[in-house]
């Protein structure tokens, strides 16, 4: 059985889905893209966004604000959004920039 160090910290199925969507779109993804994926695949948006935050925290992906500046995300940021146990649309409004694989 793999150790905790070897286990991904995020949902690998969601990460794969998002990566494929990024490849098809060939440009950074936005909340609008994630909302569309959630509808198309009958998933919760907060599950997708939790995965995106974890990918960014572990530098697999990066988040850029609406001005295009790379914004590092950390576990504290994610924990602060989870006060109500789920990420809501209101929580995510501040993240109106774009997401792309880390380079």
Regions found by a protein language model. Name each.
Residues 1-103:
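Long, charge-rich, low-complexity intrinsically disordered regions
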